[in-house]
Amino acid sequence: MMTEKLNSGHTNLTSKGIINDLQIAGNTSDDMGWKSKLKLPPKDNRFKTTDVTDTRGNEFEEFCLKRELLMGIFEKGWERPSPIQEAAIPIALSGKDVLARAKNGTGKTGAYCIPVLEQIDPTKDYIQALVMVPTRELALQTSQICIELAKHLDIRVMVTTGGTILKDDILRIYQKVQLIIATPGRILDLMDKKVADMSHCRILVLDEADKLLSLDFQGMLDHVILKLPKDPQILLFSATFPLTVKNFMEKHLREPYEINLMEELTLKGVTQYYAFVQERQKVHCLNTLFSKLQINQSIIFCNSTQRVELLAKKITELGYCCYYIHAKMAQAHRNRVFHDFRQGLCRNLVCSDLFTRGIDVQAVNVVINFDFPRMAETYLHRIGRSGRFGHLGIAINLITYEDRFDLHRIEKELGTEIKPIPKVIDPALYVANVGASVGDTCNNSDLNNSANEEGNVSK
């Protein structure tokens, strides 16, 4: 009888063990199989520089993120964390304040979007996090990234900027959003009108913090912080750290974890050139560059809104597809241009410095400073529109006699090398799949033989 009971017990134990083993095997299979069901974008096989590949080898799974968030990350095409993501995500997830310096185009947006989305509770119908950015275009871009990352999470994301109808924003914010991406003026307006209830907002992100703390937004961030709960978690990201950022840090951040990945300021994948030209030769030089370079997409910078429109008209007259964008345009028009250029509907975009902050168009491989900037910071952000996320690109500066001192000063301030444009620009420096013929190389002699071409753009 005892033997039968023991055998019966053994049989039950064995059966339970088999069932447990099968359940574990099923769970393991499920753990391994969810990735195979993802709708992944085509793999990006382009060469990447150490700006984004010099990591410790961590995987996104090691951050213990929700599976739904991981699904969004992988379906976005992000395979492994970049250095700034690897450094910032685990610290931000711990609840500490973060002060992060990293180059443009190395994954800063993901470095704060991922921990913010992970910490939001989808079951709570109130604003839990606020991301502030300096421009409307950057707000739209950031909100789109958050929406894509959160596609499998039940998190409601809202973008609010100036230039749009305030009534529409008020109606949307009453639909119980949990994450807001905003420009300073508009979110302050919503707070002052008692529409945006920030009493439960525990996370504040400041992207492009040096710009947010400039004279353009003087004092706005202090007003925003006054309307948040006491001691919110602050994640502060910037490529440059002027005195205003340091003062803000000392005033509002609590023992922040400092990350500095700025051993050098310029992206390793961007090769910089200059060409000495007369003002009246610039359009002809631009025409030469268009005809000789293998341009995927290009951004051409001018120093004033008037020159932006005039140059865009000249380029169109030369027979090239060209959009333009600047701060004085209607917001709806700006949104359309920004969207269509990102979709690749036009190869060339002429713009003012509106387009220098954080804007990510990965197809851009050529940046041209039609007008050379006066400030090193502006130059740094302009050329950072090419060579995004470790890819290759070139920056070409058209330098007049009056620009020569600014050229040498900026080169010295940034600790970088801006080379004279060579007789031949090697396509391997900026073309993903090099298949260049002789006609695809750019001759500096062509640039210098432009004295007979007027092509003048009035100031």
Swiss-Prot record:
Which intervals of the chain are annotated as region RecA-like domain 2? 432-459
Positions occupied by motif Q motif = 58-86
Instruction: Give the GO cellular component terms, alphabetically.
Output: cytoplasm; cytoplasmic ribonucleoprotein granule; cytoplasmic stress granule; endoplasmic reticulum; neuronal cell body; neuronal ribonucleoprotein granule; P granule; P-body
The answer on whether this UniProt entry bears the keyword Ribosomal protein reads no
Q: Say which enzyme class the record assigns.
A: hydrolase
Q: Which reaction does it catalyse?
A: ATP + H2O = ADP + phosphate + H(+)
Subunit-structure text: Conserved component of different types of multiprotein ribonucleoprotein complexes (RNPs) that form distinct germ granules (P-body, nuage, sponge body or polar granules) and P-body-like neuronal RNPs. Consequently it interacts with a wide variety of proteins, some of which appear to be common interactive partners in almost all RNPs types i.e. cup and tral, whereas other interactions are specific to a germ granule/RNP.
Q: What is this protein called?
A: ATP-dependent RNA helicase me31b
Q: Which organism is it from?
A: Drosophila melanogaster
State the encoding gene. me31B
